[in-house]
């Protein structure tokens, strides 16, 4: 469970960072 969740969270954070940065 933790693996896939971290992947989704990581991708989400990456998208936000790209939008902000």
Curated annotation (Swiss-Prot):
<keyword id="KW-0027">Amidation</keyword>
<feature type="modified residue" description="Isoleucine amide">
    <location>
        <position position="20"/>
    </location>
</feature>
<dbReference type="GO" id="GO:0005576">
    <property type="term" value="C:extracellular region"/>
</dbReference>
<keyword id="KW-0044">Antibiotic</keyword>
<keyword id="KW-0964">Secreted</keyword>
<comment type="similarity">
    <text>Belongs to the bombinin family.</text>
</comment>
<comment type="function">
    <text>Has antimicrobial and hemolytic activities.</text>
</comment>
<dbReference type="GO" id="GO:0042742">
    <property type="term" value="P:defense response to bacterium"/>
</dbReference>
<protein>
    <recommendedName>
        <fullName>Bombinin-H5</fullName>
    </recommendedName>
</protein>
<keyword id="KW-0354">Hemolysis</keyword>
<feature type="modified residue" description="D-allo-isoleucine">
    <location>
        <position position="2"/>
    </location>
</feature>
<keyword id="KW-0929">Antimicrobial</keyword>
<keyword id="KW-0204">Cytolysis</keyword>
<keyword id="KW-0208">D-amino acid</keyword>
<keyword id="KW-0878">Amphibian defense peptide</keyword>
<dbReference type="GO" id="GO:0031640">
    <property type="term" value="P:killing of cells of another organism"/>
</dbReference>
């Amino acid at each position: 469970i933790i693996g896939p969740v971290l992947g989704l969270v990581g991708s989400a954070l990456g998208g936000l960072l790209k939008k902000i940065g």
